[in-house]
Amino acid sequence: MAEPIAITTDPSKTAEEIGEIIDKAEARWAARKSQYPEAPDAYEAMQTVLAWNTIYDPGNDRVISPVSRTWSVPSGGWVLFEWDTYFAAYMLSLDCKELAYANAIAITSEITDKGFVPNNSQPGIKSLDRSQPPVGAFVVKEIYKKYREKWFLDEVFEKLLRWNRWWADNREIDGYLSYGSDPYDYGDTYHRSFSGIGNLKGAKWESGLDNSPMYDDVVYDRMTHQMLLADVGLMSLYIIDCRSLSEIAAVLGKTEVEKELVQRAAKYSVMLETLWDAESGLYLNRDLLTGEFSHRLSPTLFYSLLAKVPDLKQAERMMKEHFYNPQEFWGEFIMPSVARYDPAFKDNMPSPQLPLKEDRR
């Protein structure tokens, strides 16, 4: 071929001009990658996946970054999972403010009439029975700390506050938080995710961990529509959510709401402390039917560190006796999604319901 060719959406550009645009983009990419000398390959992998998954949604005139194109194609063009999308926004905030804003606003705007951001949302369908772990306020706060634009906080605050209150009103048993799935009539239209409505499967899906061995033997209460399990991971993330929202409320001058959130964080911090097992040296999930601790260990038990609930001695025990324990979580590849000694560790199986979810280990 004698002359270079180029494919473009701007027919006014010549092949040479397009080549210059590409060269400049490659130079910018190399400069960004050089900012992470300790993990350039990780940065490149992350940005490559995010770029591939970022699409235009013409129905809503927005740019979004779904969890994968493989999920989006059979879902009507796009599908947003709650915490996946917030995490995408967080990662995108490294060097693309606009995409970080777009994704955080998009998933927050999918909030249901009941007041929670759903597990998943796609054209014409939302999971109206369940949410997913409350990570939105933390991500929004972190993005704000980088770019300091208050309009962004104003855009999402009231929705995030409704969602925060929803957890306390709808997922509390005896002062603890647990995952659930509320039954509802979805009519004549059927979708594969509807098989989890109002049952244990749906409650597991609300955790975002789907087939985690933590939940293998948990009882689902058909009266409360929740797992009978005081969940360390959920309570820790909720405490972080309360604190993050309280910081946002302070920035926005919402003093009374700030106090409400600080008090709520304190309340659940006290309850989380009752899940400390001195014998094990770790915060453990508690079976709310028997009152006994569960010894199915997973990384979510370390979320209590993020919530800053353990004191120094407790934190040291958690790290020395469990994180750095090669029989549990330490090793060449960390962290496995279940302790290495757990019988389920060898399964290495993706979720039978959601084949694209990560393996157990």
Show where each model-derived region lies:
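Acidic/polar, glycine-enriched structural segments that form the non-catalytic walls/loops
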Residues: 1-78, 151, 161-164, 168, ...
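Extended, well-ordered alpha-helical scaffold segments
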Residues: 17, 21-24, 38-49, 96-107, ...
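Tryptophan-centric aromatic hotspots in well-structured domains and transmembrane helices
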Residues: 83, 121, 138, 163-171, ...
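Short, conserved secondary-structure transition motifs
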Residues: 125-131, 166-174
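Extended glycan-interaction surfaces of carbohydrate-active proteins
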Residues: 36-75, 103-123, 176-229, 267-359
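Aromatic- and histidine-enriched alpha-helix N-cap/loop-to-helix transition segments
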Residues: 76-86, 95, 127-135, 155-159, ...
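Well-ordered alpha-helical scaffold segments within catalytic/enzyme domains
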Residues: 32-35, 85-98, 135-149, 236-255, ...
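Aromatic/His-enriched, Gly/Pro-containing loop or helix-boundary segments
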Residues: 114-156
